[in-house]
UniProtKB/Swiss-Prot annotation:
Entry binding sites for tetradecanoate: 136, 143
Main localization, broad class: secreted
UniProt cross-references to InterPro entries, sorted A to Z: ApoM (IPR022734), Calycin (IPR012674)
Underlying gene: APOM
Signal sequence, renumbered to the chain: 1-22
Stretches assigned to coiled coil: none
Disulphide bond pairs: 23-167, 95-183, 128-157
Biological role: Probably involved in lipid transport. Can bind sphingosine-1-phosphate, myristic acid, palmitic acid and stearic acid, retinol, all-trans-retinoic acid and 9-cis-retinoic acid.
Keywords assigned by UniProt, alphabetized: Disulfide bond, Glycoprotein, HDL, Lipid transport, Secreted, Signal, Transport
Protein name: Apolipoprotein M
Organism field: Pongo abelii
Amino acid sequence: MFHQIWAALLYFYGIILNSIYQCPEHSQLTTLGVDGKEFPEVHLGQWYFIAGAAPTKEELATFDPVDNIIFNMAAGSAPTQLHLRATIRMKDGLCVPRKWIYHLTEGSTDLRTEGRPDMKTELFSSSCPGGIMLNETGQGYQRFLFYNRSPHPPEKCVEEFKSLTSCLDSKAFLLTPRNQEACELSSN
């Protein structure tokens, strides 16, 4: 009898706790309209890296020396290619240019990075206006990255990202300082 009462109390406690602290199911994350054939134009253009989250600090360590990053996504020479250019402003003031080519995976929402066969990127919608979320997985790491069209999105957007990713087992969180002016994004 005692065990049944205890089990019932724990059950109701769980229901109450779940109603207060609701985490969405992972399946409730909405993948963006990537159909494996062509990248939607709405996602092309300029993006700012705002925040990252991961199960451990080590998975975000690559962003520790970063002040801000500005990206430009453009359609590639083939409809299944996406060209990504970035300029990284380091905390010491240096500007570091980078380029990637993503390949759309037919029949999937995954993006594969050219030259990095172990890396998989999934894009998700964000409830934040002008926001997008990526889930990057590779050999020994998984991280969620939040981007926005504005270098300074509303604080509630960052809080929503942090809350969502903590529900997805991310214990480490990184917010880019964005104290310095963004570096000029090269056109080539």
